[in-house]
UniProtKB/Swiss-Prot annotation:
GO terms for molecular function: ATP binding; ATP-dependent protein folding chaperone; isomerase activity; unfolded protein binding. The keyword Cytoplasm applies. ATP binds at T30, L31, G32, P33, K51, D87, G88, T89, T90, T91, G415, D496. Together with its co-chaperonin GroES, plays an essential role in assisting protein folding. The GroEL-GroES system forms a nano-cage that allows encapsulation of the non-native substrate proteins and provides a physical environment optimized to promote and accelerate protein folding. The gene is groEL2. GO terms for cellular component: cytoplasm. This is Chaperonin GroEL 2. It is an enzyme of class 5 (isomerase). InterPro entries: Chaperonin_Cpn60_CS, Cpn60/GroEL, Cpn60/GroEL/TCP-1, GroEL-like_apical_dom_sf, GROEL-like_equatorial_sf, TCP-1-like_intermed_sf.
Amino acid sequence: MAAKEIKFSTEAREKMLRGVDILANAVKATLGPKGRNVVIDKSFGAPRITKDGVSVAKEIELEDKFENMGAQMVREVASKTSDIAGDGTTTATVLAQAIVKEGAKAVTSGMNPMDLKRGIDLAVAAIVAELKANARKISNNSEIAQVGTISANGDAEIGRFLAEAMEKVGNDGVITVEEAKTAETELEVVEGMQFDRGYLSPYFVTNADKMRVEFEDPYILIHEKKLSNLQSMLPVLEAVVQSSKPLLIIAEDVEGEALATLVVNKLRGGLKIAAVKAPGFGDRRKAMLEDIAILTAGTVISEDLGIKLESVTLDMLGRAKKVSIEKENTTIVDGSGAKTDIEGRVAQIKAQIEETTSDYDREKLQERLAKLAGGVAVIRVGGSTEVEVKEKKDRVDDALHATRAAVEEGILPGGGVALLRAVKALDAVKTANGDQRVGVDIVRRAVEAPARQIAENAGAEGSVIVGKLREKSEFSYGWNAQTGEYGDLYAQGVIDPAKVVRTALQDAASIAGLLVTTEAMIAEKPKKDAPPPMPAGPGMDF
């Protein structure tokens, strides 16, 4: 085991504070509409330019082990906030720095660190309750656009795209962000249920120009197993032919003889038919087939349910207004499933999302939910250079998370004002002793930090701005850093999601409180490099 170096009390806190400051100073330069960019060197490819706090924090690694510990703890604040709320990472870092600084001063002057932490926790709980009480539910699409615009660093185009995407696919819909091949940013919305399986044979194509199968008002046969011959399917095929409607077969696979027979019948013109593989694998495949069945009011033909292919009737087949099948994907539009059944299935999937502990499972469940509930929107981010596209994509990701958070828990005035106004809740906080009261006052001062930093990044004097804001008591009265004007921030469209503000404060206080109570730090001693071997002297060669 390598030898360790230990630092105690003031010396430990000073080292830690230096690390916190180095990381926070790099991150906080990005805060607000007039925040600057940070350039990050990459070991391969062009440097990355970003204004995303967590991306900056993740790149910082300090040489001094003790300073690095402080920096890594604050990096954890940014990562945690990013994971939960998706935005607000810079605000969380600024708050953590302010609480650690004030807390370290109080500990050095002889306060009890544990009581300080209890005071900090009491204050945070009171402010969070005040924020929740003042949060406004999102009432229209323009507010979603405003949240997106603020989060994307004042880029109104991104805000507009996000609002449009959420309007089209609903709050449960999936919105994905990709890099475009062109200089333009564009939005593509896929309505209905789409899954990533295409036609099994190009001979099924009905629209040769676009190389796709297009069916109006088809029947849909949903089969869990492979189809290797059509003998057992003949009764249902004959019934479909008599109805003169197209038929889509979704099965684990359609092989050899069965596929050849379907293709021959299609080419001879007697049968409008297409076959695709079922989406997903294993248990997820079963669940997705059930989803398709509920969406189209069909039945999954499964031997587990005791249904044999020979006994299938037309009323067991699903129906949809339109089906479009391309080489790589299939889209079912306007399935004829009952609204109550679909809502029941959506509620069931939401419950599974709440219960699951796996991020991968949660992502897959969210996708299934979106396909049932609304659709999928893809925002393709364009730019003149790869560096620009990556920087813009970071901002779109932030804005997307912020708009989702806003829909979830409502909105608050932006610009750091919500935290400033929520301070009035601290007057009613009861503490057990003077040291806890100092802990409460640490938070009272620390929550000014985001508003000060936004002002300073915009070239104004933070203390003057905060002083002017304190003169007024209206909750939404603040300073717009973009225009330099005072007024109602709701009316000016300067708004933050309540979830982002709340999470930033809770995560910052959680880690900062632990840093304040640190009394000793332990790190491995740096290894001394062994001296190089002596060169052979004259007359010593063998």
